[in-house]
């Protein structure tokens, strides 16, 4: 086997199933490897930003990495905005980038650039492969790093891809054990039972079904309010799921909301800050007079951490459906008249099917949607944790490939759509739902 085949076989043995790619000359051995090594299906994208956005959507819905295959530094540059979103959302991505042959780099050919430095801006882990002897181990290490909820970048020179391997052992990723800090759970239980007004701010995996179920039980026990980050990578919403109040985008409204609380417990989200530096407003949305407690757990352990908090509080094992916010589906009436942004939000909330995946990049047009959809049938919503627009249509591609049995609805702002229109070609080519 050559290096490309070793890489693909290692990834397939680790459970990876898809690769989103816009390859070039330096990636041809890997392209050929998809034909000779079974297990990973390649999906062609016409633009690298669509490939990286699709990998983000796929990873958010499966909790395992898709592979991206990008062409040299400029290909990485074209895809970097949606890798930024993936990084901010804690999405697992195996980001493979082709590089010039090792002996050709000194020629300073037109496409030569400092890939490693650029990759470092979005990668939680990265490595440049220098020999086929370590390529399987390098790939396994990258996958293990990605599974921790980050972009793991592997830079592979073309001669490492095409060279035959003297060592054909296939290595497995070594997955690190999950961690939950018990002291932080005990501290959270203490402050939640104070007689002061308290909020539990949820983010990341705390917004999955298990996390929200535990948060609902904590709310019933302690009387705290449930808040959520503004643009979560993934959140479960709808009837029967504990509802959260979204921290507003604009600083004045966000400060008004958060200043109501003397005690703040944070689970799975960094302390909230303003999106930009707004004149006359602080960057921090919390203040020094508030008592702030952070639940310390790795990304995947947050639901378990909240369940541990339930046990520490001796919260109820079950709560009534009415305690989640809505016990019955309530749909708005279909509006009449012109199709406005507000009416589009109403129509979507009125018609979206049960178990839909809503990829929400509606930006300013979708302000009415969130409060309307909280009483819709249970659904998953994905938003824009990194703020880099142009994610919606590619993310919908990845979500549809990840969950072909579920309808995917992309609520898309027209301006943001212009960045990654090529995703429509991918949706049509693959016949996605």
Predicted regions located by residue number:
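Structural signature of the thiamine diphosphate
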Residues: 17-18, 60-97, 120-169, 188-198, ...
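A cross-family phosphate/adenosyl-ligand binding-site feature
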Residues: 1-54, 160-187, 217-234, 239-263, ...
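Thiamine diphosphate
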Residues: 28-102, 200, 215, 220, ...
């Amino acid at each position: 086997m050559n290096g490309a085949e070793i890489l693909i076989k290692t990834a397939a043995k680790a459970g990876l199933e898809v690769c989103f790619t816009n390859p070039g000359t330096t990636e041809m051995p890997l392209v050929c490897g998809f034909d000779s090594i079974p297990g990973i299906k390649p999906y062609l994208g016409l633009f690298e930003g669509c490939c990286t956005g699709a990998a983000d959507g796929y990873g958010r819905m499966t909790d395992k990495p898709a592979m991206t295959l990008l062409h040299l530094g400029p290909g990485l540059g074209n895809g970097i905005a949606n890798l930024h979103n993936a990084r901010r959302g804690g999405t697992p991505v195996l980001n493979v980038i082709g590089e010039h042959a090792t002996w050709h780099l000194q020629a300073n050919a037109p496409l030569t650039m400092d890939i490693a430095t650029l990759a470092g801006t979005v990668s939680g882990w990265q490595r440049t492969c220098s020999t086929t002897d370590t390529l399987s181990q390098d790939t396994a290490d990258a996958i293990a790093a990605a599974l921790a909820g980050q972009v793991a970048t592997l830079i592979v020179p073309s001669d490492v891809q095409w060279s035959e391997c003297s060592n054909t052992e296939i290595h497995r990723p070594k997955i690190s054990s999950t961690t939950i800090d018990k002291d932080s759970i005990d501290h959270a239980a203490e402050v939640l039972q104070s007689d002061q007004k308290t909020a539990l701010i949820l983010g990341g995996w705390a917004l999955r079904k298990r996390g929200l179920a535990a948060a609902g039980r904590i709310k019933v026990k302690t009387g705290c309010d449930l808040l959520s980050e503004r643009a979560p990578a993934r959140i479960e919403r709808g009837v029967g799921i504990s509802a959260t109040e979204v921290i507003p985008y604009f600083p004045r409204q966000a400060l008004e909301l958060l200043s109501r609380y003397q005690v703040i417990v944070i689970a799975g989200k960094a302390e909230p800050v303003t999106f930009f530096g707004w004149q006359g407003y602080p960057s921090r949305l919390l203040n020094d007079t508030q008592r702030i407690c952070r639940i310390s757990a790795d990304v995947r352990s947050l639901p378990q951490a909240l369940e541990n908090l339930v046990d520490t509080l001796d919260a109820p094992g079950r709560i009534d459906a009415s305690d989640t916010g809505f016990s019955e589906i309530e749909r708005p009436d279909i509006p009449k008249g012109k199709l406005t942004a507000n009416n589009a939000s109403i129509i979507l909330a009125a018609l979206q099917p049960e178990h839909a995946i809503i990829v929400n990049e509606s930006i300013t047009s979708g302000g009415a949607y969130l409060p309307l959809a909280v009483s819709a049938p249970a659904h998953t919503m994905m938003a824009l944790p990194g703020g880099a627009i142009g994610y919606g249509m590619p993310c919908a591609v990845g979500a549809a490939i990840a969950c072909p049995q579920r309808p995917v609805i992309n609520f898309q702002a027209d301006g943001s759509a212009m960045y990654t229109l090529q995703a429509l070609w991918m949706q049509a080519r693959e016949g996605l739902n």
